[in-house]
Swiss-Prot record:
This is Somatotropin. Belongs to the somatotropin/prolactin family. Coiled coil: none annotated. GO terms for cellular component: extracellular region; extracellular space; nucleus; plasma membrane; secretory granule; trans-Golgi network. Disulfide bonds join 78-189, 206-214. The keyword rRNA processing does not apply. Gene3D superfamilies: 1.20.1250.10.
């Protein structure tokens, strides 16, 4: 793949990382509306980061003629497709806030291990030279969700057995077609799962605070 395509990829992801909200790791005592706003903002940013990373990886490594057939096979690859989580806004509206928070926590925690291997793939990236920053963003969102669960339950968040599930690590052998397809699938799942977490948080914020924007 041409060097300029990969350079565009690195710059896109690096810029998104720089735009991460300041003091992202801080979730001090604050009103419930602020806890929701902060969590939604972080989920939106992570989802955008995941979507743009997937798109640029696709441009750099996946031939256009193969993308459609590969994408059709990726749904079954995602661990999140095997759990009874809502698949969209309408289904999410039928669940309680605590159910949505637990599903959101599950989705975030399932990626905490795999993202630590991103640095083995994107060794020349300004942002992915180390995976620590992506990991920190996920940990920050995890803390925000746990803060919401504590606020709503008035106690420590409960984590069930389903939270033990996780994804495979990314494959560093970028010269292997199998590794490229595996990483492509993982990035697709990362994008889908972050979209779900963002949707759940926005549904909760919308129905709790009428002043919130519900057009999404």
């Amino acid at each position: 793949m041409a060097t300029d395509s990969r350079t565009s990829w690195l710059l896109t992801v690096s810029l998104l990382c720089l735009l991460w909200p300041q003091e992202a790791s801080a979730f001090p005592a604050m009103p419930l509306s602020s806890l929701f706003s902060n969590a939604v903002l972080r989920a939106q940013h992570l989802h955008q980061l995941a979507a743009d990373t997937y798109k640029e990886f696709e441009r750099a490594y996946i031939p256009e003629g193969q993308r459609y057939s590969i994408q059709n096979a990726q749904a079954a690859f995602c661990f999140s497709e095997t759990i009874p989580a809502p698949t969209g806004k309408e289904e999410a509206q039928q669940r309680t806030d605590m159910e949505l928070l637990r599903f959101s926590l599950l989705l975030i925690q399932s990626w905490l291990g795999p993202v630590q291997f991103l640095s083995r793939i994107f060794t020349n990236s300004l942002m992915f030279g180390t995976s620590d920053r992506v990991y920190e963003k996920l940990k920050d969102l995890e803390e925000g969700i746990q803060a919401l669960m504590q606020e709503l339950e008035d106690g420590s968040p409960r984590v069930g057995q389903i939270l033990k599930q996780t994804y495979d690590k990314f494959d560093a052998n970028m010269r292997s077609d199998d590794a490229l397809l595996k990483n492509y699938g993982l990035l697709s799942c990362f994008k889908k799962d972050l979209h779900k977490a963002e949707t759940y948080l926005r549904v909760m914020k919308c129905r709790r605070f009428v002043e919130s924007s519900c057009a999404f």
